[in-house]
Amino acid sequence: MKLFKFVLLCLFLISPAKADTIYELIKIPNLEIYNIKTENKLRYLNAKQAFTIGIDNNINCFKSSKQDLDKKYKIIEKNLNRYSQNFLKKINLKYIVMCEDLSISGINTAGIPDNIMKTLIVDIKFNDRYFERVLHHEVFHIINDSFKDIFNQQIWSSFNPKEFNYAECSTCTKKIGLETYSKTAGFITEYSRSTASEDMAEVFSHLMYGNLPATVDPI
């Protein structure tokens, strides 16, 4: 009986300790470990309760059911296993946070990358039609944020028609469509027209996911 009580006490003490450790690492509360034994050493975490983060507390995400987590985890892992441990270390990505109904300032989003905290938050309820592709889109933002000198937005923008201008930010425009154009006219999706960084991310995601249009424009 004493042994049983001791085990219960240990479990009670260890669980909060793990949660506190996770918070100290990535500054996101209410998380628990989903899987940390992966090929490329990515740590998968999930929301055990809704959480709110950000300087202005403007980022929100909610707990998912185990059934939904199990289903989407397989898809996420399959796609992110394309990136080696060495590559992920170079770009500073270590933690994948799974939750649903992810939003920033009230605007729903597929993912929120943070190369400083080595974290990518993923909305597992994002549109299934684009879900796998947007995983690579968000990974590109991690790459871009880690190597801004390589991905020069001015050089990228110079390939566009002179009369075209990107929006000041991705949320400053209504160009949010993710459907792949059959006729690209210099852009692969409507969202590509929003900002240079989103344009790069859309091209990268199509290359990684393997669904480039049948014909693309010459540079």
Task: Enumerate the language-model features and the residues they cover.
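Hydrophobic h-region of N-terminal signal peptides that target proteins for export
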Residues: 10-17
